């Protein structure tokens, strides 16, 4: 049976970079599950790579069709932004392993949908001061920086990824992203061990 490797972490902890590097490795034969969002596309993003970008009408249509596995809504200073996972044919756990990024709330919903055995959580940590600087640097590169939203998201993460919630979700293994090379090495070793052990047990 295949697994879904689920990357989590606070904003600007380096999840996107870790995701791209793990996919670049190619040694674990991980496939992507591209989530959907109604937020505006950022500079440097491409539709269908980090996310499928849609609007509220598109979300409601998929919801009515019963294709939304999990969804989250954030009341931002620019209106409601939704992030969601869709049962659109991307996921086949009979033989394939997948890699995706999400929130703790989404992880719990994915676990409820697919089962605990199908999901491998990978929680990425980084000092708050470093995260805040990274978030600011990213906004400065945008054509129209959204500083208010950056601050809202930074503060919301403290509640969304509180120690109590992490413990309740059963998140134990954590990976410090101060040094990207070491972080990637640790995650790769962790996943190779678990995916290999899982495959061997299924044979």
What are these regions (language model features)?
Residues 13:
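ATP-binding Walker
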Residues 7:
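Hydrophobic anchor at the beta1->P-loop junction of P-loop NTPases
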Residues 140-190:
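Small-molecule kinase domains that catalyze NTP-dependent phosphoryl transfer to phosphate-bearing small molecules
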Residues 99-103, 117-135:
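Conserved phosphate-donor/acceptor-positioning beta-strand/loop module used by diverse small-molecule
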Residues 16:
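Walker A/P-loop
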Residues 10:
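P-loop (Walker A) phosphate-binding loop of NTP-binding proteins
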Residues 37-98, 102-104:
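ATP-dependent small-molecule kinase phosphotransfer cores
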Residues 196-202:
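Conserved small/polar residues in nucleotide/adenosyl-binding loops
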């Amino acid at each position: 049976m295949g697994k879904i490797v689920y990357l989590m972490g606070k904003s600007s902890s380096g999840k996107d970079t870790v995701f791209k590097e793990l996919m670049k490795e190619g040694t674990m034969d991980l496939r992507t599950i591209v989530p959907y969002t109604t937020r505006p596309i950022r500079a440097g993003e491409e539709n269908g790579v980090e996310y499928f970008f849609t609007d509220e009408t598109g979300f409601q249509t998929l919801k009515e069709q019963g294709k939304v596995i999990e969804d989250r809504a954030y009341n931002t200073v620019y209106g409601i932004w939704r992030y969601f996972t869709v049962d659109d044919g991307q996921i086949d756990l009979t033989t394939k392993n997948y890699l995706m990024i999400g929130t703790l709330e989404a992880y719990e919903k994915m676990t409820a949908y697919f089962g605990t055995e199908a999901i491998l959580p990978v929680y990425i940590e980084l000092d708050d001061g470093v995260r805040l600087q990274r978030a600011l640097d990213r906004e400065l590169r945008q054509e129209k920086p959204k500083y208010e939203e950056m601050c809202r998201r930074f503060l919301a993460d403290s509640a969304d990824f509180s120690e109590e919630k992490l413990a309740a979700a059963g998140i134990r293994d954590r990976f410090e992203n101060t040094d990207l090379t070491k972080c990637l090495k640790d995650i790769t070793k962790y996943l190779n061990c678990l995916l290999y052990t899982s495959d061997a047990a299924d044979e």
